[in-house]
Amino acid sequence: MKRWVGWSVLTVVAVLALVALLPSWVPVSAQGAKPAKLVIAAVAGNESLGLKAVAPTYERESGIKLDIVEMPYPTLYEKLVTTFQAGAATYDLIMLDDPWMPKFGTEEWLTPLDSTYGFKRDPDIPGVIYDVGTWPPPRGPVPPSEKSKPKHLLGITVVGNVEMFMYRKDLSPAPKSWDEVLANAKKLNKPGSMAGYVVRGAATNPIVADFLPILWSFGGDVFDASWNVVIDSPASLRAVKFLVNDLKSVAPSGAENIDAADRSRLMAIGQAYQSTVWPGEVTGIVENPKVSKTIGKVGYIPMPAGPSGKGYGMMGNWLLAIPKASKNGRAGADFIVWVTSPKVQKAYAEAGGIPSRTSILTDTAMNDKNPYFAALAKSLDAVPNWRPRTDQWNAVETILGTNLNAALAGLATPEDATKKAATEIRALMKKAGY
C-alpha cells in the first residue's frame, strides 16, 4: 500500500531516515496539518486489546490523541448504522466485523482507501485479507444491486481472526478429518469429566459460526453461486445431522446453550478434548496463565477435512475503515498504515493483538509465545471462506441459527429444521430482490 501521498522528495527522504531510527513514522505532522484527536469506534473485548496497547505509542509519536470508544458487539453495529444513516461525523475510524462489509459497502458509507489514499497490496499480508475488505466482493456471488459497481478497498484488517481447530495434543495426534474428530471424541469422551467435543450451540450467531466450517467441508452451503438457497440440499443436510446427532453425542449436556466463553473455559480447565476456536479465545482464556490449567497441552490446526476432501476455515476479521463523513480521513488513513506496519504489528501482537502479517505469524520467537500463530498463518494461506457477502446476512444468520439451535435442542429434526430454514431464507431473499 502507498504510505505517503503528495509529499516532496526531500520530505520522503527525511521520513525514511527517521523510520530507520524509530519504530514508527508520523506523516500527518510532517504534512503540517493534523487533528487534535482521532475517534475510533471499537468492539469491546479481546479484539481491541492490541489496539489499546499501541495507542500510547501512537499518541506520543504523532501528537494526536486516540479516543477509542468501546461498545459490545451488537451495540457497536447498531450505533454505526444509526450514525451513518444520520450522516454524522462522530467517528474518524471504525472497527467492523467482516460480515458487516456487505451492508456498509452496499450503502456506500465508507471511504475507498485505494482510490482516495493510494492504498496498495503488501506482499507480506495475505491476499484474502485485502479481498475481505474489498467491495463488491472479488470472488463468490455478488448481490444483484452491486454487480455494476467498481471494486474498491474499503477496509484493512486489524484483527486477523480465522476460525481454527483446537485439540489436546497430549492425548492424541492432530485429527486430519471430521471423521477422525468424531472417532477421537468417542474414545476420549467421559461424561461429567471430559467432553469429546464442545459444540458451540447457542442460538443465532454462535451455532452458525460453529457450523459453517463443517457445512462447507461436507460440500454444503447456504447459497450456491447464483444465490439459490441450498441449505436443504443433501450435502447440507448431512452436515446438519453430523452436528446435531454425531457431535452432540460427545458434547457436554446443554450444548444448545454453550457459547465461545464456555468452550474455552472447558478447554482451559481440562474438561474438553477438542472444538473449533477463534484466536481471541486462545489469547484470552486457553493460553492465559491466569486461568488455564492446560497451557502447553493444546494444539492448534487449520480446520479438518470433510467428505469434500478439504477443510475450510472461516474468516472473522475485524477491519479498520474510514467513514465517509469523517473530517479527518487523511489522518485516519495514516493511522491504518502505522498500526499495520511491520514494527507496530510486532508490538501489537506482543500485547495480545491478533496480527495478519505473514512475517509476524511465522516468526519463530513469536510462535514460541503464541502457539496458534502457525495454524493461523496456514489457515490464511489456505484462503478461508467468508460468510455470504450479502447485506441480508444478519437476517439469514438469525433464521439459520434459530433453526439449527432448535434441532440441537431436540425441538426439531434435522430434516424439519433445514426445511424450515430454507423456506424462510428463500422468502427473505426474494423480498430483498435476489
Which role does the model predict for each range below?
Residues 2-109, 115, 119-122, 256, ...:
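Conserved N-terminal structural module of periplasmic/extracytoplasmic solute-binding proteins
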Residues 143-159, 163, 180-229, 235-236, ...:
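Extracytoplasmic/periplasmic solute-binding protein
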Residues 98-164, 176, 180-182, 295-301, ...:
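Hinge/lid segment of periplasmic solute-binding proteins
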Residues 56, 147, 151, 162, ...:
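Extracytoplasmic/periplasmic substrate-recognition and gating elements
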Residues 111-127, 201, 218-238, 287-293, ...:
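Short, solvent-exposed loop/beta-turn-alpha elements that line the ligand-binding surface or hinge
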Residues 92-95, 273-278:
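Paired acidic/hydrophobic, glycine-rich loop segments that form the ligand-binding mouth/hinge
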Residues 184-191, 226-257, 299, 303:
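Glycine-centered hinge/linker elements that transmit conformational signals in sensory
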Residues 128, 146, 298-302, 350-402, ...:
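Long, aromatic- and glycine/proline-rich binding clefts that accommodate carbohydrate-like moieties
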